């Protein structure tokens, strides 16, 4: 009888906590846990914001993983991965604290506030340093993105004496794939430019900006809570300065591990424990 009640509850409210389920049916949390885990074979999954892969993506993810793992270890520290992300003035929901009871990993999305003040931040990351931040005042397009690459990244951030040893990655966002942008980057980085044909689409689980940098920054920049966008920028810059070289090296070791897992998953999504 109690088991049936719990089955109905978790079916209707899959995000129900053990404590609330126990209170609803009048039993102990320990009893509920054993029913969920041992009898119903459920697990408390974290929310993951995954991009649904298309059929052609699997091969591209495999190809990239094999390419990366064939590189000499000494070149890994010379790979620069880049990305943009919105930072909202209001503290976002922390999905790390959310769980859903399920027999398999669910696909769940959450939304950011619709009209909240926000800034668009560009950063790049290597095993040695974080490049940026650079702030786009409006949405990014091929023109202001190329201007950023030329006037900020190239002239002020990336020392020209060093650039020939670096690989440069960007994802397939429309401003990145514009012909003018692709041509300029190929001219600067030559065969070390990881272009739109080489980088697998819908693969934030491979980009260190996505699987480390943005999440880390967003967990730190709201303490203290910013009152203005300038406060938020100052917090972002403060936290970037705190990131140690050791953390960056571990992040790129994680990058390598993820490539190995993608091969094991035959190009599919990977679950990092």
Please give the residue ranges for each predicted region:
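Surface/interface recognition patches
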Residues: 1-273
């Amino acid at each position: 009888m109690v088991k049936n009640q719990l089955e109905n509850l978790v079916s209707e409210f899959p995000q129900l906590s053990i404590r609330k389920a126990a209170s609803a049916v009048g039993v102990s949390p320990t009893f509920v846990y054993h029913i969920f885990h041992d009898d119903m074979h459920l697990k408390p999954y974290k929310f993951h914001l995954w991009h649904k892969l298309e059929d052609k993506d699997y091969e591209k993810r495999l190809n990239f993983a094999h390419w990366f793992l064939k590189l000499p270890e000494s070149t890994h520290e010379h790979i620069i991965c880049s990305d943009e992300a919105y930072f909202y003035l209001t503290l976002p929901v922390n999905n790390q604290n959310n769980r859903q009871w399920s027999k398999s990993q669910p696909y769940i999305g959450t939304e950011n506030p619709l009209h909240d003040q926000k800034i668009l931040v560009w950063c790049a990351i290597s095993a040695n340093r974080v490049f940026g931040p650079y702030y786009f005042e409006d949405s990014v397009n091929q023109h202001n993105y190329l201007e950023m690459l030329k006037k900020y990244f190239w002239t002020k951030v990336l020392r020209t004496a060093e650039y020939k040893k670096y690989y440069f990655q960007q994802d397939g966002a429309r401003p990145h794939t514009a012909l003018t942008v692709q041509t300029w980057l190929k001219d600067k980085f030559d065969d070390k430019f990881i272009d739109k044909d080489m980088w697998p689409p819908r693969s934030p689980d491979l980009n260190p900006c996505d699987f480390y940098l943005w999440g880390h920054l967003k967990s730190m920049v709201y303490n203290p809570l910013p009152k203005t966008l300038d406060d938020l920028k100052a917090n972002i810059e403060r936290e970037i300065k705190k990131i140690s070289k050791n953390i960056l090296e571990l992040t790129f070791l994680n990058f390598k591990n993820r490539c190995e897992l993608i091969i094991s998953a035959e190009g599919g999504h990977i679950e990092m424990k």
